[in-house]
Amino acid sequence: MGNNKKVCLIIVDGWGIGRNDHTNPIFLYKTPFLDHLKQNYPYYALQTSGIASGLKYLEEGSSEVGHLILGSGKVIYQAKTRIDQSISNGEFLKNKILLEAINHSKNNNSTLHLIGLIGSNETIASKEHLVSLIYLARANGFNNICVHLISDGKDGPKNEILEIIENLNKESTTLGSINIASITGRFYALNEHSEMYIDKFFKFLISNNQNQQEIQYLTELKTKSISDEFIEPFAIKNIFKPISSNDSVIFFNLKPNSFPIEYLANKLLQKETNISNLKITSLVDLNQKIKSVY
């Protein structure tokens, strides 16, 4: 007879090993079943961050990273780690796919649009990658850049976008102006559940009829208790340019096969949009239509 023993892997998302004090709700509440398992069966801890998860030392993990490692049964270096390494060793500045995207706008005298999330939690996108993209473009003699920031407010503090932008400008003095062209909350730009909100972001990006504001408009939103996640798309006066024919777009988010980004990219490429000769690139894989870098 065959071996009829069964194994069941149950992933309790968000559950972890914490301190035995008031900061740990798992410790404060009764968990008799799990206590029984610990008392009667062997167990051990898994590290869900840093090098063990294919990230930088001490870097915070995420559910996407954890599920990938568990499913593969081995450490897979995340896109962020690979990109960070390429920036450190100089390979990023020689990347053919990125240079193609920049030269497309350069040769067509058009605009390079950089689109991605920005926040203190860098599991979805990285400020360093954004700065490196701007540096790469300017190192190749191209300055016509529009940065479309997606504010977080979900995986990080609720109102940090203005502070992050101020710090970004301070840290990037050698680059000159970052050219922030628009800001949109992730509820609209990265909504996993409703295409309607992504459509609003899409129409915003291709239209000239915008809610035009100064960057300090973010202070007004904060006083109204509007968190970064729910900021409706607004354009920065005198900087915003809509995505148009002959332009180039680089998405710098790090989540592969992201539905919102893939949906947005596909919308931009539709014939009905009437945007021709548009070049779209992503740092990570979206689909077979879009060139990916890593």
Please annotate each region the language model reported.
Residues G2-C8, G16-F187, S276-Y294:
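Active-site nucleophile/metal-coordination loop of metallo-enzymes that catalyze phosphate/sulfate
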Residues M1-G2, I243:
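Short, flexible hinge/linker loops that cap or flank conserved catalytic cores
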Residues Y29, L93, E128, M196, ...:
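Short coil/turn linker and secondary-structure boundary residues
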Residues G156, E160-S244, P256-F259, Y263-N266, ...:
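Long, well-ordered, tryptophan-enriched scaffold segments
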